[in-house]
Design a protein with these regions (language model features):
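Conserved active-site and cofactor/substrate-binding residues in soluble primary-metabolism enzymes
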Residues: 40-45, 57, 88, 92, ...
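Flexible, low-complexity linker and terminal segments
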Residues: 2-19, 220-351
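Thiamine diphosphate
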Residues: 1-144, 197, 327-351
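Short catalytic-loop micro-motif centered on adjacent basic/acidic residues
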Residues: 35, 108-110, 184-189
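Glycine-rich ThDP/TPP pyrophosphate-binding loop and its adjacent helix/strand module
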Residues: 117-118, 125-133, 138, 142-283
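Solvent-exposed alpha-helices and their adjacent loops that cap or buttress functional pockets
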Residues: 26, 35, 53-57, 98-102, ...
């Protein structure tokens, strides 16, 4: 992956987190993406989210597929484990890694071409299997590496930079994640870090399949009049359903709010999602209502953003598979080959 090394010097008084790390310790090399690319804003949001959550970089595994979006893990969390897989296959690689070692925090980064076209089957199965992961789709509506053709998430009626009209129906990744059983579903905009950073933090702390559809304008091929993924269009049609604040489980929870305007959602690890309702009739715990809301707003030409759905009691793959709590590379021969007596007991249980 192409990159430019970043100077390691920084101000001696740069703030540190509880681990003693500065924000620079969560960065990577200098990005080689186009100047102004929305993907770089998402990378910056990931850096800040991990820094503020005091996450040890070596405990994070970042995985990606192929595309502009899949280049971005090079540019953040330089001290983390990384794997750049083949086109559309990141979800399967992530699932296998998660099964082998549940102790890591898994962050999958993909794009609308990588996950909504060639990798759509991989995406759907990873979500329905309840893999404990954060899955971010950097959604720009075009194939940026191959000069701006429409992707599967491009809206019907959208116009390409060359003036071509898209006649195909768009795939809504957030709706598909809801249908497949994701227990944390959000949508955001790369140009809104105030909204995006807490959404990423909430996803990182969520013990289940967390999905974020992040609209990320392509400044080279999809930031013009007629595009429904441009900076101007998204800003004009963005309708936030709520504003999320992330309260770390290790911090004292001090909340001052008016009844009916804020909802607190406590997760298994003690972290708290503080939701400031903007759409008063929106229920973040109703999966069916969330799907209906997305469809209704799509017909109105609006782009709902914010935390769309969260299940405070999520199911997670290791829980229902009853897998070992130890990483596979720590299992000894006695654990893997318990002997003839154990085999006979297993066979007897199946008769």
């Amino acid at each position: 992956m192409s990159y430019l090394p970043k100077p390691k010097m920084h101000h001696p008084d740069m703030p540190t987190n509880a681990l003693g790390y500065t924000r620079r310790d969560y960065e990577g090399p200098i990005s080689t993406l186009c100047a102004g690319c929305g993907h770089d804003s998402i990378s910056a949001a990931i850096v800040r989210a991990c820094f503020e959550l005091d996450l040890p970089p070596h405990r994070i595994a970042k995985l990606s597929g192929i595309g502009c979006s899949s280049k971005t893990p090079t540019y953040f969390l330089g001290a983390s484990h990384g794997f750049n897989s083949v086109h559309g296959r990141m979800p399967s690689v992530l699932t296998g890694a998660n099964l082998a070692n549940r102790d890591l925090i898994y962050l999958g980064v993909s794009g609308d071409g990588d996950s909504a076209s060639i990798g759509i089957g991989q995406f759907l199965h990873a979500i329905r299997r309840a893999v404990n992961m954060v899955y971010i789709v950097e959604n720009n509506g075009v194939y940026g590496l191959t000069k701006g053709q429409f992707s599967a998430t491009s809206d019907r009626g959208a116009k390409s930079k060359r003036g071509v009209i898209n006649h195909d129906e768009a795939i809504d990744m957030a709706s598909m994640a809801l249908q497949m059983g994701a227990t944390y579903v959000a949508r955001s905009f790369s140009g809104d870090k105030t909204q995006l950073i807490p959404l990423i933090q909430g996803a990182l702390e969520h013990p289940g399949a967390a999905f974020i559809d992040c609209i990320s304008p392509c400044v080279a091929f999809n930031n013009h009049d007629g595009s429904t993924k441009s900076y101007d269009y998204v800003r004009e049609h963005n309708e936030a359903v709520n504003q999320l604040d992330m309260i770390n489980g290790r911090d004292e929870i001090l909340v001052d709010y008016a009844p009916g305007t804020v909802e607190l959602v406590t997760q298994h690890d003690g972290s708290v999602l503080q939701l400031r309702k903007l759409a008063q009739d929106y229920d973040v715990h109703d999966r069916g209502a969330a799907l209906a809301y997305l469809q209704r707003k799509k017909e109105d030409g609006e782009i709902p953003t914010g935390l769309l759905f969260v299940d405070p009691e999520p199911q997670e793959m290791h829980g229902y598979l009853k897998t070992t709590t130890k990483p596979l590379n720590e299992l000894r021969e006695a654990d893997l080959v318990p002997g003839a007596a154990a085999l006979e007991k297993l066979n007897a249980s199946l008769r």
